[in-house]
Amino acid sequence: LKLGVGTQSIGHSMMPSIITSEYLTDAPYFNLRVFSPIFNYNCNITQLSRKTHLYTHRIETILFKKIQFSFMEGVLPYGNFDLRMINPFSIYHGYGIFNEISNECSSFFGIKVNVTPIKYLRLYFLYAQNEHTMSSEEDKSIPEGSGFQLGLESYIPSKKGYFHIGCEFYYANPYLF
């Protein structure tokens, strides 16, 4: 259980993370984390302004000691603090809050994958989405908001330390966030 003010980053990358970057500084937050060697659950409430709170939860798992997979869901209602969002086992999209608050609510979805195929090499993929218009929706005025990061990095040992080599590709359409 953590209560504090500071940065919160999801996904270690060379450029700022497309999911949540360390450049969001001085934001008060409440964090509940439950973890084991193969499973991690994280519930987070970040206060962005007096009437704006970002509610997120994340589930992470490690498979075969080489693959880490994370799924994150979040909602950003513009209004007063909402007690319904404190339930750590809630699925935010199931509350119908989007119909209740109308256009004053944003959703968020993120995926993080880390793969370590061999020692000293890491491949990673980060995906973020905050808007998706279904083909069945009548109003097509809201544009898609998504982006991803793909990279690899290696720390090669030497006698006096490590050489850090990496490459990263970053794409975000203009309407992400």
PLM regions and their residue ranges:
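Small/polar (Gly/Ser/Thr/Ala-rich) solvent-exposed segments
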Residues: 4
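Secretory-pathway/luminal and periplasmic proteins that interact with or process carbohydrate-rich
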Residues: 12
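"Short basic amphipathic alpha-helical interaction patches in structured regions
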Residues: 15-21
